[in-house]
Amino acid sequence: MKNLNDGYAKIITDETLRETISHGSEEYPFRYYYEDIWLFDLHCIDWHWHPEVEFVLVENGTADFFVGSSRYVLNTGEAIFINTQVIHRFESSESTIIPNMVFSPLLIAAENSLIYRKYIKPCLLYTSPSPRDVEE
């Protein structure tokens, strides 16, 4: 059986809403989470951002995903990609299981490689709302 929420139930951020937990290490820049949004404080993964990219799958349930100023409702079997440094929040009114991967884009290709310059960097430079665009 998979462990839900890996021992924590609240996102901790600094004054800019940057998440303070490390997602992997410099040597291994990848972290897999298996979480139930319902088990988090106030049944949400509150506003935060990080320099890593994130893939989130809704394995079971329904959740509202707020990414920048946009809202997406995802159901079982649907997924979302969250770009680097983009403010986001997840909430649910029921138990909703979300396996997710948070990792450095450099895991895909080295910064000085053709793959990075041609395919990865343009995705990372896509203009999305920044953490500063969200008001309390």
List where the protein language model places each region.
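Generic protein-terminus/edge-of-domain signal
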Residues: 1-66, 70-72
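Tight coil/turn sites that cap or link beta-strands
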Residues: 41, 76-77, 85, 104
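Residue-level detector of short, conserved catalytic/binding motifs and their immediate flanks
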Residues: 53, 78, 99
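Active-site loop signature of alpha/beta-hydrolase-fold enzymes
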Residues: 64, 89, 134
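Short acidic-glycine-tyrosine-enriched beta hairpin
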Residues: 69-81
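Ligand-binding loop in jelly-roll beta-barrel domains
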Residues: 85-106, 115
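Double-stranded beta-helix
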Residues: 106-125
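Single conserved hydrophobic/aromatic residue that forms the stacking wall/gate
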Residues: 126-136
